[in-house]
């Protein structure tokens, strides 16, 4: 695997800055960059925490980096509503604090996470600042991206080669830019992407759409559980 220039610049920035913010849409290599950053820090004996809002996102970090990530609530030792054992009076003991899916974190939880970090700890936050805002008040990650300059912020724009093959990612990014991904003549089934992983089904009435949706769902349950 070879990193492109913007990815290398992002990795270097994250290893040399006290605060580093990484933003980019799906398929621009955030996970690969995260893997390199975690590897560099851990191999050089830095202590590190890796956190995400959801358990699924934390699991993805662990799978991608082999580094044990946790939810923010578990990292902070949540014992009740907005009650954490790791806090401004009892900081987390770590050289580097990494937060993934930063755009999903609301202002209240972000404040608790930030207060639990020591002044000498390096901070790395990754996410997509153009995603839907988090549940709860505040859109902290997006505000941070707009507030800091490119000495702190890395904006990834170049899609990785594998992402360019995915119909799901290509079409999602078109929709994100308010561009209709379907340009061909409508037919019952349209497949997009070199990987053929994105398909559309069209029917002439609501009942047919309902039937195909139920059938597809049941088939997925049968195959994937």
Predicted regions and their residues:
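Walker A (P-loop) phosphate-binding loop of P-loop NTPases
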Residues: 27
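Conserved lysine of the Walker
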Residues: 30
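Hydrophobic positions on the alpha1 helix immediately C-terminal to the Walker A/P-loop
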Residues: 33, 37
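Pre-P-loop entry segment of helicase/translocase ATPase cores
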Residues: 1-12, 16
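Short hydrophobic/aromatic beta-strand immediately N-terminal to the Walker A/P-loop
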Residues: 20-23
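Conserved helicase motor core of P-loop NTPases
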Residues: 10-13, 130-225
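Hydrophobic residues in beta-strands of the RecA-like P-loop NTPase core, especially within AAA+ ATPase
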Residues: 99, 126-127
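Conserved P-loop NTPase motor core of helicases/translocases
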Residues: 46-116, 155-159, 168-182, 195
